[in-house]
Design a protein with these regions (language model features):
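Cation-handling catalytic/transport regions enriched in His/Asp/Glu
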Residues: 1-333
């Protein structure tokens, strides 16, 4: 399947998609960079420069592993009235082209790219002029992943996958048969994974909200949580809490729930595009105006309600995960 996702086709399709949705133009420009592989892009709206970003895509010796986005410059209004243009870094560790052959990507790498580009857009498409609330600055911990996971959903959408795939040898897009297998693999044991995440989140929250270290037992607390939500129970000798680095060493103390909550928000936002057209510019502009441009100038839940017209619901996440079926259209006599 990797041969179907050539890097040039994926990037071209991704850029076309966000240009359509958010009314922007992305153009590569030459400038000084820290490595020959790094690319620099300007983002314009109606010909006017509004942002820029660097893309450092390939793995190399001495480079930190993983994928991430970071802000290099935040949009803000200076005391002299000058408006600072936002700039971001988009960093991954994909395999570089070899011997002149076009680089290809796994679909997992495609979703990683979409995810980090969602973060990038969140920072550079802001309309705020105060640095503290501009871009990704000040966004609540349980909503900062909304734009990234939102954009990920497009990487699983049939028409988008068709548009970004181009076989390295034949030039054909991903066949429907392989697309169905791709979705089936994504949804395999999705219910078990969801329940496991709920278990982690509930244990974390109870540990930080109600646990008394003088009288309570950590294993007993986890056992109580598992009795409430678990489907598969680990052996008695399991010592999961001792290795739960996310909440003890990774910054997610009393916040592990944010992983699943961001999925709820992002899936619900994406469902608006399913209802109104996946590449509907009108829906895209509304998402831009009510969420991306807002930064942290108002509460994230207010941003969501302004876009969706209601409070978050679970249905979209359960459906996109394959846990429940899509509702059938009612038949008319």
């Amino acid at each position: 399947m990797k041969r179907y996702f050539t890097q040039n086709a994926v990037f071209a399709g991704l850029f076309r998609m966000v240009e359509t949705l958010f009314g922007i133009e992305i153009e590569e420009k030459r400038t000084s960079v820290w490595h020959p592989d790094v690319k620099y892009f300007e983002v314009k709206r109606e010909g006017k420069l509004i942002a820029a970003f660097y893309a450092d895509l390939y793995a190399r010796e001495g480079k930190r592993s993983g994928a991430w986005m970071d802000g290099e410059r935040t949009r803000r209004r200076l005391p002299d009235g000058k408006l600072v243009t936002p700039v971001a870094y988009l960093v991954t560790n994909f395999a570089a082209p070899v011997e002149g052959r076009e680089a290809t990507m796994t679909h997992d790498e495609v979703t990683t790219l979409f995810h980090e580009f969602g973060h990038t857009l969140h920072h550079i498409l802001t309309a705020q002029e105060e640095a503290q609330v501009s871009g990704i600055n000040g966004v609540e911990w349980d909503a900062v992943e909304l734009p990234s996971q939102f954009l990920e959903n497009f990487a699983w959408e049939h028409d988008v996958v068709k548009a970004i795939s181009r076989h390295a040898d034949t030039g054909e897009s991903l066949p429907d048969e392989l697309f169905k297998k791709l979705i089936a693999a994504k949804n395999f044991e999705a219910g078990a994974f969801c329940v496991r995440q709920v278990e982690f989140a509930l244990f974390d929250m109870l540990l930080h909200a109600e646990f008394n270290p003088k009288t309570d037992s950590v294993p007993a607390l986890l056992d109580a949580v598992r009795k409430e939500v678990a489907v598969v129970f680990p052996p008695k000798w399991n010592r999961f809490p001792q290795s739960f680095a996310h909440i003890f060493a990774g910054g997610y103390a009393a916040g592990y729930y944010s992983y699943k909550w961001a999925e709820v928000l992002s899936a619900d936002c994406f469902s608006a595009f399913e209802e109104e057209g996946v590449l509907n510019p009108k829906t895209g502009r509304r998402f831009l105006t009510e969420i991306l441009e807002r930064g942290s100038s108002r509460d994230a839940i207010e941003n969501f309600v302004a876009f969706r017209g209601r409070k978050p619901e679970l249905d979209a996440l359960l459906r996109l995960s394959g846990i429940v079926d899509a509702p059938q259209a009612s038949k008319k006599d």
